[in-house]
Amino acid sequence: MVESIAAGQVSDNKHIEMWKVKKLISKLEHCKGNGTSMVSLIIPPKDDINKYGKLLTGEMSAAQNIKSRITKQSVVTAITSTKEKLKLYKQTPTNGLCLYCGVIYMEDGKTEKKINFDFEPFRPINQFLYFCGGKFQTEPLLSLLADDDKFGFIIVDGNGALYATLQGNSREILQKITVELPKKHRKGGQSSVRFARLREEKRHNYLRKVAELANQNFITNDRPNVTGIVLAGNAAFKNELAETDMLDKRLLPVICAVVDVSYGGENGLNEAITLAAEALTNVKFVAEKKLVSKFFEEIALDTGMIVFGVDDTMKALELGAVETVLLFEELDINRYVLKNPVKGDTKTIYLNSTQQKDSKYFKDRETGMDLDVVSEDSLAEWLCHNYQNYGAQVEFITDKSQEGFQFVKGFGGIGGFLRYKVDIEDHHGDLGAGGDDFDPDTDFI
């Protein structure tokens, strides 16, 4: 088997790319070789690709000293495959290059198979790795799975405000301002009323300034440039900012946490990052819940603007009617293209793991003749590589939330929002592959 995920095939949807990497890591980790028959090579961005060709040549020479004939042959085969893949690249791709080549055992533990993976990661891996052994080294790929959502922080108190972003483990201070607000006036009489009014006016102007700078720092091209915003402070300022209409309406929906901190400035930022950690983790979780809840609402309202089940969803996708595909990240359905060897016509079917073991799906219904398998793909992987051809987007759903669990159990783990209504033959009584029959009385909790 030869698999190549070459530069230029990178999707603009980071969650899809992360899903692909997660599946690839799982596939690589399940590969077992005979002795030292598997090569892992990761080349960092901007490195001279020619020096790695020389590295492999040196490793090839060293392999000639291996006494065991079988081991020597395995190592030479793996290094040769890696060199051949490396020759396909004149220079190191922008984000670096990952190569995994070698000979592995099949599930029976006896049959051997040659596999080659080469791909440019969807973001840089700034780490060199060369390893020749009985398994692939995937640890550097784990960095690609770190969610790089950017979050904004506003730390505000009576001394000033700080604006910052947090992306992964990297934080950036965007702006700092200081303020001198008048203290409360202890004397009575008319002067206290006047001072109180002036103090309140300055406080109001200060908060308005904080809000204006929030707009400047966290809105780009008329939309928020961060996934979520954390408001933090050691006084009532943060609460007033969240509850008044000073903040731009476009920012209000992305406020994910309001936390009390003991300090202002950078110390307050450090504390806010710690206190808001759970809220930041839940942002994607909440977004998923909202998306699936909207899907359920469309069903309840019978708008005709959603589709579910593998057969209906794929039919609507082929018609170009699906705007967003909802896809269970562990979807256990394969896509088969079958060909009648006599008539020459082909058909596409979708089978879950149980159905794949039933030979009836691979026979002609009229004649009982065996059909040729033209192609077999994981449906999820096929969608991730082809969704753009249909003008659609893909959103992954987990079964970790109540809504996600319902989506997987009741709707087969696949569905979609439509651009327009389409007339699809009603198969809702039988979802086919991957799902139980949908019962509106039991599948909504």
UniProtKB/Swiss-Prot annotation:
It is found in: Cytoplasm. One of its GO terms (molecular function) is translation release factor activity. Pfam families: eRF1_1 (PF03463), eRF1_2 (PF03464), eRF1_3 (PF03465). It comes from the Eukaryota. Keywords: Cytoplasm, Protein biosynthesis. One of its GO terms (cellular component) is cytoplasm. Its main location: cytoplasm. Heterodimer of two subunits, one of which binds GTP. Directs the termination of nascent peptide synthesis (translation) in response to the termination codon UGA. In O.trifallax UAA and UAG codes for glutamine. Belongs to the eukaryotic release factor 1 family. This is Eukaryotic peptide chain release factor subunit 1. It comes from Oxytricha trifallax.
